[in-house]
Regions:
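Active-site proximal loop and beta-alpha junction motif in alpha/beta enzyme cores
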Residues: 3, 27, 92, 113, ...
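N-terminal lobe of the biotin/lipoate ligase/transferase fold
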Residues: 1-82, 86, 150-151
Length: 173
């Protein structure tokens, strides 16, 4: 798996969608995003400390992007639960909450030419963020805020990607 790393980027999802012929499972990872994206026109607050990445998905038998997004939401929730003994809630199709506050969001988009060239999935997970702006503090949380300690972003990334690979392989069989 190739990982393209950035200290700061506008959006990992925009970068991923502009790749010409990316290999499946290429990951675009940023420590900070200046224009992180959510569903529709939503903005994803992406300061240093969070886990922000997009992954190029292989062609799959799942053609419905919403199904892929829901699958990823369950995987992210599972990783949170298994690693940190927390009880995330999934607001279908693409948001994950802890105690009523958003902790993660997922967006999946196709890049289309004459046909679908590839799909890019973006995941924003609030990990090592210790505070949010006033307009978000009642709506957003982070693993750091819930646990009182920093978490290993690389370990979480690896677990999410490995689980995605496993689930998509199983579906493809």
């Amino acid at each position: 798996m190739e990982i393209i790393k950035f200290e700061k980027i506008d959006s990992t999802q925009i970068f991923a969608k502009n790749l010409k012929t990316p290999e499946p499972w290429t990951v675009i990872l940023a420590k900070e995003q200046t224009a992180g994206r959510g569903e529709g026109r939503d903005f994803w607050y992406s300061p240093k400390g969070g886990l922000y990445f997009s992954v190029i998905l292989p062609k799959s038998k799942i053609e419905d992007l919403q199904t892929l997004t829901i699958l990823a939401a369950f995987i992210v929730a599972k990783v949170i639960k298994e690693n940190f003994n927390l009880e995330p809630f999934i607001k279908l199709p693409n948001d994950i909450y802890l105690n009523g506050k958003k902790i993660a969001g997922i967006i999946t988009e196709n890049v289309i030419g004459k046909e679908v060239k590839f799909s890019a999935m973006g995941i924003g997970l609030n990990t090592n963020i210790d505070s949010f702006p006033k307009d978000l503090e009642n709506m957003a949380t982070s693993l750091n805020m819930k646990l009182g300690k920093e978490v290993d972003n690389e370990k979480i990334l690896k677990e999410i990607i490995e689980e995605l690979k496993e689930q998509l392989k199983t579906i493809g069989e």
